[in-house]
Amino acid sequence: MTRLPIAFAAMLLASTSAFAADLYVEPDPQPVAPAFGGFYLRGHLGMSNQQLGSLEHTLFDDVEIHEFLDEGGFDSAPLAGIGVGYQFNDWLRADAFVEYRGDASFSALDRYGHTGGAGTVWDGTNDYSGTKSEWLLMANAYVDVGHWHGITPYVGAGIGASRNTISHFQDVNVPTAGVSYGDTASTWNFAWALHAGVAYQVTDRMTLDLGYSYMNLGDAKTGDLKAYDGSVTNEPMHFKDITSHDIKLGFRYSLQ
């Protein structure tokens, strides 16, 4: 008779353990936060859309009447840059890059004259042409504005220095059959930029970046202006307030 209660107790204990096991529910796995932080390499290609604030020379003040028929501008030009950056967290990063901005053709047209008995007498015109290029060094900071399915909009700003070079400059005065040339000259300027764009994370390490930048590149100037036969030398031509609207396609490669 003793064996029956023992067997019954064993059955009761086993059924209780099985019931308790049925009640246990394994907790859901906790989401793993994405990894941020670390160095990255960056590179980009793009096109510039540049503007000129003004073209200035001391001789403009030596004539009674002077006006621009075409105030001057630059053609679009290619650009390319490489750099290195650091991602501090999921919303803040910074980088520095060096960028070469290729030759952009320049043209402008003015005329000058004096007051005659019947009104303005135009004495001549100046047809200006040349090319401009830059080497740009810039440090930037960016704020990533959220993350949606691998897409990250961002805004940023940067400061740096731009080495602006004017080359192949010439001034052709058709009415007087005069031609002058400007030597190639380069000047360093303070530069600043505002950035905006959108990035797409292709892999854990690779991110594509489509961006826009407003660039303020400072000023530039030619070398001394010389007549075609070297008989006359004048001061350089000055290019004031050079700006650009840049479109760039680039990548970022994480080193972490």
List each model region and its residues.
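Sec-dependent signal peptide recognition
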Residues: 2-8
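Outer-membrane beta-barrel biogenesis signature
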Residues: 19-43, 50-55, 256
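N-terminal signal peptide c-region/cleavage motif recognized by signal peptidases
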Residues: 15-17
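Outer-membrane beta-barrel "beta-signal"
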Residues: 40, 241-256
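Short, contiguous, helix-prone interaction/anchoring segments in small proteins
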Residues: 38-64, 73-77, 83, 87, ...
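Repeated loop/turn-to-beta-strand initiation elements of outer-membrane beta-barrel proteins
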Residues: 91-94, 149-151, 200-208
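Residues on the lipid-exposed face of transmembrane beta-strands in outer-membrane beta-barrel proteins
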Residues: 43-45, 82-86, 139-143, 157-161, ...
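Extracellular/periplasm-exposed beta-strand and loop segments of Gram-negative cell-envelope proteins
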Residues: 50-75, 100-136, 161-189, 217-246
